[in-house]
């Protein structure tokens, strides 16, 4: 294997490994729902919409609870077409200061997101002519920017793990793992579920990774991601060394975390390296290299809701120093 074969980010190909295609459920229009329908009826149909779109269980439960609270305040029989911006603002004020129950900034932000997503769905479905939640100002709770690897740390990590390919006792796993996450930005859980048949080597110079989910409700997160030409020879060496059968990584997730810790030590990176750190590093590098925002969202397998909070952080990390 040559250095050219193992190049992780080939020159002249910004954003390589970014196919990020995502399968989406077919949209279904709410049956028999009009602007005169009750809020309760709309909420019931919105539940089905969330399931079809692959919202996570936690998101579905949280949104349903938020809408129940809103329905209790404004009236479940209220016609959805009669709900205006002033009604939403009064609800938010009541929830924050007059309800008598503590409402943290994070909870407040989520409930506003619930209203925005709910009414945006009604407008997109042509049930309402305008969105009363659109003018609401979203106040995201301040959270620290995630830690990413600097360019010199990325280079050191790649170099040190690549050297293990030719060590007296060769080990392809560290380099395969590091390069895979830096190229694709997949989650730890997704990494653990990769099976050999999920990687298409029809074109060895442009292999493709398919991210699959057994749960049909997660189908919106399924996607195909391009891998660089250097992935093929490293994967072949890894297969010879580890002989995976059922899954590509047939160890525990904790074991792979140890692999990253050892790799960070070899690279001289203090504080270690985590899956999440590599995922954020991938996202920032792709955005900095000109990948369109929505393509990056699809590549990371994020919903539009999660993206509202994630994109500003990526933009702040990718922009030049002041």
Where are these regions (language model features)?
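N-terminal core-binding DNA-recognition domain of tyrosine recombinases/integrases
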Residues: 26-32, 44-145, 164-166
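Alpha-helix N-cap/helix-start motif at helix boundaries, enriched for small hydrophobics
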Residues: 60, 115, 177-178, 185, ...
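DNA breakage-rejoining catalytic core of tyrosine-based enzymes
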Residues: 128, 141-159, 218-229
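Catalytic-site neighborhood detector that most strongly recognizes the C-terminal catalytic loop/helix
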Residues: 148, 300-322
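Basic, Lys/Arg- and aromatic-enriched nucleic-acid-binding interface segment
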Residues: 156-188
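Short basic/aromatic active-site micro-motif
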Residues: 172-173, 253, 270-290, 300, ...
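Conserved tyrosine-mediated DNA breakage-rejoining catalytic core shared by Y-recombinases
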Residues: 193-231
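Active-site/catalytic core of tyrosine-dependent DNA strand-transfer enzymes
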Residues: 226-270, 282
């Amino acid at each position: 294997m040559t250095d050219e074969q193992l190049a992780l980010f080939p020159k002249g190909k910004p954003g390589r490994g970014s196919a990020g295609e995502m399968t989406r459920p077919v949209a279904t229009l709410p049956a028999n729902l009009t602007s005169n329908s009750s809020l309760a009826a709309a909420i019931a149909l919105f539940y089905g919409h969330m399931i079809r779109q692959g919202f996570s269980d936690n998101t579905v439960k949280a949104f349903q609870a938020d809408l129940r609270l809103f329905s209790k305040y404004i009236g479940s029989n209220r016609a959805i077409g009669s709900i205006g911006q002033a009604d939403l603002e009064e609800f938010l004020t009541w929830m924050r200061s007059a309800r008598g129950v503590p409402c943290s900034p994070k909870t407040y932000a989520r409930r506003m997101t619930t209203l925005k997503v709910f009414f945006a769905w009604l407008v997109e479905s042509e049930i309402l002519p305008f969105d009363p939640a659109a003018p609401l100002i979203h106040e995201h709770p301040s959270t620290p920017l995630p830690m990413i690897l600097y360019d010199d740390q990325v280079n050191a990590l790649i170099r040190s793990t690549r050297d293990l390919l030719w060590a007296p006792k060769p080990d392809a796993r560290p380099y395969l793992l590091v390069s895979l996450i830096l190229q694709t930005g997949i989650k730890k859980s997704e990494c653990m579920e990769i099976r050999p048949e999920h990687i298409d080597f029809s074109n060895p110079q442009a292999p493709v990774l398919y991210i699959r989910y057994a749960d049909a409700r997660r189908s919106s997160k399924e996607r195909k991601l391009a891998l660089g030409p250097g992935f093929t020879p490293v994967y072949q060496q890894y297969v010879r060394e580890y002989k995976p059968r059922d899954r590509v990584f047939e160890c525990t997730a904790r074991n792979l975390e140890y692999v990253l810790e050892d790799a960070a030590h070899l690279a001289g990176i203090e504080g270690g390296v985590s899956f999440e750190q590599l995922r954020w590093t991938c996202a920032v590098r792709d955005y900095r290299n000109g990948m369109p925002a929505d393509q990056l969202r699809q590549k990371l397998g994020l919903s539009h809701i999660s993206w509202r909070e994630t994109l500003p952080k990526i933009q702040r990390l990718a922009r030049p120093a002041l």
